[in-house]
Amino acid sequence: MPDIHIKNTRIYYNNSLRPAEILIENGKITKIGKDFRVSSSDMVIDAEGALTLPAGIDVHVHFREPGMTLKENWYTGSCAAAAGGIATVIDQPNTIPPTTDRRSFEQKLKLARKKSIVDFGINGGVTGNIEKLRELWRLGVTAFGEIFMAESTGGLNINEETFEEALAEIKKLGALATIHAEDEKMRLELEQLLKGDVSYDYHSKVRPNACEASAVQSALELISRLQVRAHFCHLSTLEAVGMIRKEKYLAKRENKKPLFTCEVTPHHLFLSAKDWERLRAFGKMNPPLRGSHSIKALVNGLNDGTIDMVASDHAPHLESEKDLDIRAAPSGVPGVETLMPLMLAAVRKNILPLSQMIMVTSWNPAKAFGLDRLGKGWLEVGFDADLMIVDPRNLQPIRADMLHSKAGWTPFEGMDAVFPEYTLSRGEVIWMEDSINAKPGRGEFLEGSGKRSEEDEEENSEETGSD
């Protein structure tokens, strides 16, 4: 007997949108078809008029715990994810303490296991801790980074020498490096030059397009020389997209798979430098808001496959922290709950096709971060039943008072969105009828591919000792 029977729905399957029914048992999709004769099931969801899609995978969140729980914690952040159709997240390391060694990793893992209602991975931080990276990899971190090439929240930025050393070590481990690409030297020079500027768009001026482009170019050269797998976080500029497109074209011409992937955020897709006046310091994030030419390049890159995925860079701060002058306010905006609804609205408005939305919010993130091996990322028999059920006709404005993050505000206030009616995680309904339907701690830790058990470590030590 199936646990859940979804009927009267439509799915995107084998390159077309078609009517279907889905049976779910023991957390997995067990059957996809039509007109099932099911005598009974624990739950029947009549999805008349709605689409059933893979739930989102957000590879870039800052859930702020430990150390900054006034802004967010694992429970509130994961509730926001579930309410927005996200069933898997990957948390970044710039917490207090940062996730840079065994102790800090195990502290964060314990908290996440106790509180998260969605499945999760944890990235390892990179500072001067090169000797700790192997240990973190074997503990099960998903990837390393984001590695900050320039100053940002948490103070984990590193210099050029350490950056190269880190990438070399990550290459040895066979791991993935995730990169925040901004040129710190350029940023500091512009900060000094513009120290009298008090306008809100000051932040875009000290981190201009050239700041990102310079860092991306430097990183691409290192990636190529070291042959390390890498992922660029939150690309935001016309210039960076052009570089990525060129490198991918050259790889394809030589019948090679690119060594890197890249992401874009909803705030760089759907907000612009024109929003500074409306948002003031609430629009401050790293990298900053960009002009219309960059936004057009991002949309084109998303459609033609240059950009691999969309991630929220959910980085919440309280209203009281953001309601300051542009220099004093911290960088970052909340976004995990609005990622999928904004992307669904973009499909509704023909900004990108549904098939591409599914690729950039689920399948591509799963592949890039090794989650496909754990059954994530696709609506197919044998995969985890991580699903969202949405009625694309239900376009509604985003309101901060309907969201679940502790931030209490959103830069997307009033913008069109399509929110899910149901979110399922491993066959459990965690969001339905506008309410959370899951207990803290039901989320599972998704071990990275470098994970080793204590037995493996002992065996490895014995083998090393006998050489």
From Swiss-Prot:
Its required cofactor(s), as named, are: Zn(2+)
Show the GO cellular component annotation of the record: cytoplasm
Please list the coiled coil stretches: none
Which reactions are catalysed by this chain?
Answer: (S)-dihydroorotate + H2O = N-carbamoyl-L-aspartate + H(+)
* Binding, Zn(2+) 2: 146, 180, 234
What are the binding positions for Zn(2+) 1 in this chain? Answer: 60, 62, 146, 313
Q: Report the InterPro entries cross-referenced here.
A: Amidohydro-rel, DHOase, DHOase/Allantoinase_Hydrolase, Dihydroorotase_CS, Metal-dep_hydrolase_composite, Metal_Hydrolase
UniProt entry keywords in alphabetical sequence: Hydrolase, Metal-binding, Pyrimidine biosynthesis, Zinc
Catalytic-site annotation from UniProt: 313
- The EC number of this protein is 3.5.2.3
Pathway listed: Pyrimidine metabolism; UMP biosynthesis via de novo pathway; (S)-dihydroorotate from bicarbonate: step 3/3
Residue spans with biased composition (Basic and acidic residues)? 441-454
Q: How is the cofactor bound?
A: Binds 2 Zn(2+) ions per subunit.
Annotated GO biological processes are: 'de novo' UMP biosynthetic process; purine nucleobase catabolic process
Kind of enzyme, top EC level?
A: hydrolase
Give the Acidic residues compositional bias ranges: 455-467
Give the GO molecular function terms: allantoinase activity; dihydroorotase activity; zinc ion binding
The similarity comment for this entry is:
Belongs to the metallo-dependent hydrolases superfamily. DHOase family. Class I DHOase subfamily.
Give the HAMAP family listed for this entry.
Answer: PyrC_classI_A (MF_00220_A)
Question: What the protein does?
Answer: Catalyzes the reversible cyclization of carbamoyl aspartate to dihydroorotate.
Q: Which NCBIfam families match?
A: PRK02382.1 (NF002668), pyrC_multi (TIGR00857)
Protein name stated in the entry: Dihydroorotase
Q: Which organism is it from?
A: Methanosarcina acetivorans (strain ATCC 35395 / DSM 2834 / JCM 12185 / C2A)
